[in-house]
Curated annotation (Swiss-Prot):
Organism: Chlamydia abortus (strain DSM 27085 / S26/3)
GO cellular component terms, semicolon-separated: cytoplasm
Residues involved in Zn(2+) binding: C133, C136, C149, C152
Catalytic activity, EC: 2.7.4.3
Region (NMP): 34-63
Protein name: Adenylate kinase
Coiled coil: none
Binding-site positions, ATP: G14, S15, G16, K17, G18, T19, R130, V139, Y140, A198
Annotated residues for binding of AMP: S35, R40, L61, L62, V63, G89, F90, P91, R92, Q96, R159, R170
Domain notes: Consists of three domains, a large central CORE domain and two small peripheral domains, NMPbind and LID, which undergo movements during catalysis. The LID domain closes over the site of phosphoryl transfer upon ATP binding. Assembling and dissambling the active center during each catalytic cycle provides an effective means to prevent ATP hydrolysis. Some bacteria have evolved a zinc-coordinating structure that stabilizes the LID domain.
């Protein structure tokens, strides 16, 4: 596991983590590991961890860190991650961040954290105007004027949790649980903050400059 390098893409909901993670994965030819996709895959395949996670989700409870970390660790140990990967949506709590840092230290793997900074006003505007392809999960903005995914020809839909009420709750949860990670990674010297209210192309150029520095 020597010579690995991982990039953790962080930011509030609607900051563009998924979009920028996918672009960075393509650019660096590294796998893109989305915690959301890990959850969906584990639950859909009824894996042991997926079954346990579903039990909590179905009761409206938070999935314990031990189960979440089990899924992530399993993914990180896959052969395709032997040269590193782009991590999107994890960690979400300080305890998860400590588990991940310990894993990297024990694996002699290097990692960097990129924080996408976006104001709450911009986040609300973005999320309230976005649509997704139910097949490939690509995100589109209503200003693009598309009704179907150009790649999959599937009708674009709005995520059921992209309502103003849910958006505010997600932002509150982020501020409480995930924002403290910024200080943690800053103290470790792992963090780079990227202003991310510009166009996706401009933000990606900033990310490229960051990883080349």
């Amino acid at each position: 596991m020597l010579n690995k390098i991982f990039y953790i893409i962080m930011g509030p909901p609607g900051s563009g983590k998924g979009t920028q993670s996918q672009r960075l994965a393509h650019q660096l030819k590294l796998p893109h590991m989305s915690s959301g996709e890990l959850f969906r895959s584990a639950i859909d395949s009824a894996s042991p961890l997926g079954i346990k996670a579903a039990e909590y989700i179905n009761q409206g409870l938070l999935v314990p860190d031990a189960i979440v970390w089990g899924m992530v660790q399993e993914a990180l140990n896959q052969p395709e991650c032997q040269s590193g990967c782009i991590i999107d949506g994890f960690p979400r709590t300080l305890d998860q961040a400590i588990l991940l840092n310990d894993f990297f230290m024990q694996s002699y793997a290097d990692y960097r954290v990129i924080q996408l900074d976006v104001s709450n006003e911009e986040i609300i505007r973005r999320i309230h105007s976005r649509f997704i392809c139910p097949s490939c999960k690509h995100v589109y903005n209503q200003n693009q004027g598309l009704s179907e995914c150009p790649t999959c020809q599937m009708k674009l839909v709005r995520r059921s949790d992209d309502t103003l009420e849910v958006i505010h709750k997600r932002l509150e949860s982020y501020e409480k649980l995930t924002a403290p990670l910024i200080d943690y990674y800053q103290e470790l010297g792992k963090l780079t903050r990227i202003p991310s209210e510009a166009s996706p192309d401009d933000v990606f150029q900033s990310i490229e400059a960051c990883i080349k520095a």
